[in-house]
Design a protein with these regions (language model features):
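A polyanion-binding, active-site-adjacent surface
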Residues: 1-288
């Protein structure tokens, strides 16, 4: 008796009409807030596989959504004035698909504050707990340090334009008060929004507060902040000054480090055409 061919027991292929890709109008799931969810009840999967890979040091699988985002995107903003267009940009931040589909970012955007016609624009990295709760950039102790810096310059928040490089707080599993810096991908997705802000505000100088902001604006890679500060750079046809983030000043008592930040602020004031007194020039210098 001959041996017949073994039956094919492989499962049939799925129907052609079945697709794992979500519908175009599907939004990412609402993430729990610290007030609503105890830390032991947050499902890590709700933050997306990509974030788990980031936290575990694994490169995520590349998809169409991982394609490079052009730095120079032309947004169709409503309004005639810069203020109206900035308001339109604020609405776009909430609904723009590249940001909306980022599972590694939380749900609440934190846009800019201050004067949309300011000569000085300051850019910090991303919202943390305080910023997400209060809805403004640089809140909490870091914000208090910024306010003190501005007061020493003869300014207040209403005199500058303050914004984030990344407009959403980077997410973490079981996140309550802890924060994390934005990833390179989150910065890449967010950069066209910042560029549009700079083009609308048209400041005389942009101040990059911290290494992350500097890396995003200048595309400086792993160049340390110490090598970037002390001079002016150019990005988006605008002079850029790099200095330490106010949060750094909270962690150091070194007067020489504080003097470095103040020297940067003096250069920013000169670039913006602001008057500088002899008293201001002598701040944080050793007493004779």
């Amino acid at each position: 008796m001959g041996h017949g061919r073994a039956p094919d027991i492989r499962p049939p292929p799925p129907p052609a009409s079945v697709s794992a890709k979500p519908a175009a109008n599907e939004t990412r799931p609402k993430q729990p807030t610290p007030e609503q969810t105890p830390p032991d009840s947050v499902d890590e999967a709700s933050f997306g596989n990509e974030l788990r890979d980031i936290l575990n040091g694994v490169q995520p699988h590349k998809t169409e959504e991982d394609a490079p985002v052009p730095r120079h995107i032309s947004f169709d903003l409503e309004g005639e004035t810069e203020e109206e267009k900035l308001s339109s940009l604020r609405e776009l931040v909430v609904n723009w698909p590249p940001l909306r589909n980022m599972d590694s970012l939380r749900e609440t955007p934190v846009f800019s504050s201050g004067n949309p016609r300011a000569d000085i624009m300051m850019v910090t990295d991303a919202p943390g707990l305080y910023e997400e709760k209060q809805g403004v950039p640089l809140a909490g102790p870091s914000g208090q340090k910024l306010d003190a810096m501005l007061k020493a310059m003869g300014l207040s928040r209403s005199d500058i334009y303050l914004t984030h490089l990344v407009k959403y707080r980077p997410a973490l599993p079981r996140q309550l008060t802890n924060n994390r810096p934005p990833t390179d991908r989150e910065i890449e997705i967010s950069l066209p929004i910042l560029r549009e802000e700079i083009m609308l505000v048209r400041p005389k100088v942009v101040v990059a507060l911290g290494a992350i902001s500097a890396r995003g604006i200048l595309q400086s890679g792993e160049t340390p902040l110490s090598a970037l500060r002390g001079t002016f750079h150019t990005a988006f046809n605008t002079p850029v000054r790099v200095t330490y983030n106010p949060s750094y000043l909270l962690r150091t008592e070194d007067i020489s480090e504080k003097r470095k930040v103040w020297e940067d602020m003096l250069c920013v004031m000169e670039q913006a055409g602001l008057p500088i007194s002899e008293k201001q020039r002598s701040y944080f210098l050793p007493k004779k």
